[in-house]
């Protein structure tokens, strides 16, 4: 662990060694804080809180299609279901099999090579060896509604048409696929369904993201990880929405409530990592080992919260949006404290 990381731990009252010990303390702290927040979300009266700047927003990404390339933006709205740039929302589109089951880069790694351009009311998709295709953001209401399946939960999606379905089928060359779009008239996946045994978590809905409306990582945490890897990785391996500079490695583990721009966020959980992190975003090749194995060597959770994270290493944080608004690259990131 680097000296800057040790400084952060000392400042936060956590011991520098061993790593597993302070990770356990941080995880227990997360559970304790969450247990006290049942009635927090939009029900408690506003209280005066101090603001402590902990960093600066250095990057913002929106991922319109789940598992495809992210779109870097300078400014974004934060809705209760995640980021939005104009009419395009984060992970509101998803590739599915013909039976409605989701398809991600875990099964089709080359999805990460599909790039997306936002222009007016259209998405333009490009991929290696394929002609670009233009997809309207607003779909005809007559398009079929599919019953989809995402991590064992039911959710609906409106079919995006035969042309783009054939485009993905031709590109991936394994079986027939469809592209579906979520709209806000549909029912999202709720906290109670995502984590039925964790009743202390604040209530929110998501469309096609894995777990939460916002995913945040610090630059310093990636730097720390790269000191342990033979082959360095970049932030795109981890697909965050917000990247923060100016803090120390894994300091984001301790952030409970944040103010960025005029957006207030509440910590939900740490981000458990899976084999998707081993897909190279530049080649679409899945390694299945790194950086996941290295993360497992020093970023496992405390046994007390193993029911949530199992054997997945933790890297990055999930947040819910408590006060809607907008934020932009360059905004200070404030930790809100009593």
UniProtKB/Swiss-Prot annotation:
GO terms for biological process: cellular detoxification of nitrogen compound; nitrate metabolic process; nitric oxide biosynthetic process. The keyword Repressor does not apply. Disulfide bonds: none annotated. It comes from the Eukaryota. There is a cross-link at residues 59, 138, 144, 156, 173, 187, 289, 296 (Glycyl lysine isopeptide (Lys-Gly) (interchain with G-Cter in ubiquitin)). Binds 1 Mo-molybdopterin (Mo-MPT) cofactor per subunit. Keywords: Acetylation, Isopeptide bond, Membrane, Mitochondrion, Mitochondrion outer membrane, Molybdenum, Oxidoreductase, Peroxisome, Transit peptide, Ubl conjugation. The modification N6-acetyllysine is found at residue 156. Ubiquitinated by PRKN during mitophagy, leading to its degradation and enhancement of mitophagy. Deubiquitinated by USP30. It is an enzyme of class 1 (oxidoreductase). Its EC number is 1.7.-.-. It is found in: Mitochondrion outer membrane; Peroxisome. PROSITE patterns: MOSC. One of its GO terms (molecular function) is nitrate reductase activity. It catalyses: N(omega)-hydroxy-L-arginine + 2 Fe(II)-[cytochrome b5] + 2 H(+) = L-arginine + 2 Fe(III)-[cytochrome b5] + H2O. Residues 188-336 form the MOSC domain. Catalyzes the reduction of N-oxygenated molecules, acting as a counterpart of cytochrome P450 and flavin-containing monooxygenases in metabolic cycles. As a component of prodrug-converting system, reduces a multitude of N-hydroxylated prodrugs particularly amidoximes, leading to increased drug bioavailability. May be involved in mitochondrial N(omega)-hydroxy-L-arginine (NOHA) reduction, regulating endogenous nitric oxide levels and biosynthesis. PANTHER family: MITOCHONDRIAL AMIDOXIME REDUCING COMPONENT 2, MOLYBDOPTERIN COFACTOR SULFURASE MOSC. This is Mitochondrial amidoxime reducing component 2.
